[in-house]
Amino acid sequence: MAELSTENLAQGQTTTEQTSEFASLLLQEFKPKTERAREAVETAVRTLAEHALEQTSLISNDAIKSIESIIAALDAKLTAQVNLIMHHADFQQLESAWRGLHYLVNNTETDEQLKIRVLNISKPELHKTLKKFKGTTWDQSPIFKKLYEEEYGQFGGEPYGCLVGDYYFDQSPPDVELLGEMAKISAAMHAPFISAASPTVMGMGSWQELSNPRDLTKIFTTPEYAGWRSLRESEDSRYIGLTMPRFLARLPYGAKTDPVEEFAFEEETDGADSSKYAWANSAYAMAVNINRSFKLYGWCSRIRGVESGGEVQGLPAHTFPTDDGGVDMKCPTEIAISDRREAELAKNGFMPLLHKKNTDFAAFIGAQSLQKPAEYDDPDATANANLAARLPYLFATCRFAHYLKCIVRDKIGSFKEKDEMQRWLQDWILNYVDGDPAHSTETTKAQHPLAAAEVVVEEVEGNPGYYNSKFFLRPHYQLEGLTVSLRLVSKLPSAKEA
C-alpha cells in the first residue's frame, strides 16, 4: 500500500513538473504583464493537462513528447465530437445543399447571357405557399409572380430557361400535389423544373436497394400510386424532370484523403455504409450539363449521352480497405445501375445518373421527363408524343417560345398583313434550321437544333389585326437505341444484289 502511494505521488509530481514546463513555455510566448494574467495562464494549462491526461500516464519526462500526447488526446476528443456533428441528419442536409450549389456555380461559366439566381425556400414552405393558391387562383401565388410575371411577363424581362429544385419527391399526396403545381408554373413560363426522386418513391429506404425488385414498372401499378400515375399522364408533367441517385459531393476528411489543417481529424466512414458520406442532389449535375450546352451552342439540346453532353466528370473517388484484405472503391453515385435497369427507370419517367465502373466518370444516358407519353392509333401522333416527353427537344421548343413572345410584342402596332407576318416568321425560324442535316456535324446540329420548320398564320374571324400562328418544328433526332443482329453469311447482301 505504501509502495502504491509512493508511485502515485511520484506520478503526480511528474505531472506537475510537466505542466510547469508547458506553462513556462506559454508564459514566454504570451508574456503576461500582470500577476493575474500569469496566474490565468498557469490555471488554464493545469486544467488542460488534467483533462487531457485523465486516466492516462505521461509518455516520458520529455516535455515535447508530453505536449504531443496532450495534443493527440485533444485531437481524438475533437474528432469524436465533430464526427457526431457532421453525421447528424440536419447537418448532412445543410452540407448537401451548399455543396450542390457550390458544384453548380463552380462548373458553370456565367456571363451576360447565362446567369444563376438562387431562391432560398424550403420544400415545406414552397408547398405551403402554392397550396394557398390552388385551383383557378394558381397564377396569383407569389411564386408564380416571382418566376413568371417579373421576367417572362414583363417587357424587357429575362425569362428563366430552367428551374432547379434541391428537393426529393415521392408518390405521397403532398409531393404529387407540389409537383403538379410546379408543373403548371413551369409550363406557363416554358422552363422545365429539374429536381430529384427519393428512394421512397419505389418503397425503398435507400438507392442501395434499387437492384432488388425484379420489375420496377409493377411497383407503380398498385393503388397507392394512383395520384402519381395521374400526374404522369397530365400535359404539364412534361416540364418535370426527376434525377436519381445522388452523387458524392466530397471526399471524407482525413490525412490520406482531404487533410484538415486545424487538427488531426479523421472522418469516420464505413465504406459499405453510405449514410456517413456527403452526398449532393444529382439535379445539380444535370443543371451543369444544361448550362454547358447553352454556353457552347446557345441551346440546351446536348445534355445527355456519354459523348453528347451528358457526362459528369471528376467525381470524388474514395477507396477503402475491405474485410478480405483488398481495396474497393466507393461508388460516387450511391449505386451502380445496369443498362436494363436504366431503361426501366427512363420508361417510368426518371433520369438516372450512371457511374462508369472503376472511374470517376458518370453520365446521364437519357433525359426523359416525368410525363408518360400517350399512345394513339396514329403512329405519327404517338411519335410526336414521345418527342414532346424528352427534355432535349422540350428545351429547344421552350427557347423558341421565349423569343416568339418578345418578337410578337415588339411587332404590335406595326402594319402587318397575314401573308407578310407569315413570311417574316418563316424567314426568322429558318435561321435555326440546319440546311444539310444528313451531312452536318454534331456541333452544327447543336447550334441549329431544327431539321425542318414551317409556320402557318391564320386570321381570327371577327377580330381584325389578330392572328393565330402554328409552328411545326422537326428537331434532329437523337439516338435512343440500336437493335443489333449478327449473322454469318457466305455473301454480303450488297454482293448478292450486284
Swiss-Prot record:
It holds the Pfam family VipB_2. Signal peptide: none annotated. Disulfide bonds: none annotated. Disruption phenotype: Deletion mutant shows a clear reduction in E. coli killing and a lack of ability to secrete Hcp1, VgrG1a as well as Tse3. Core component of the H1 type VI (H1-T6SS) secretion system that plays a role in the release of toxins targeting both eukaryotic and prokaryotic species. Forms the sheath of the structure by assembling into tubules together with TssB1 resulting in the stacking of cogwheel-like structures showing predominantly a 12-fold symmetry. The sheath contracts to provide the energy needed for effector delivery. The C-terminal region is required for cogwheel and tubule formation. Forms a heterodimer with TssB1. Heterodimers assemble to form the sheath of the T6SS machinery. Interacts with TssA1. This is Type VI secretion system sheath protein TssC1. It comes from Pseudomonas aeruginosa (strain ATCC 15692 / DSM 22644 / CIP 104116 / JCM 14847 / LMG 12228 / 1C / PRS 101 / PAO1). The lineage of its organism: Bacteria, Pseudomonadati, Pseudomonadota, Gammaproteobacteria, Pseudomonadales. The gene is tssC1.
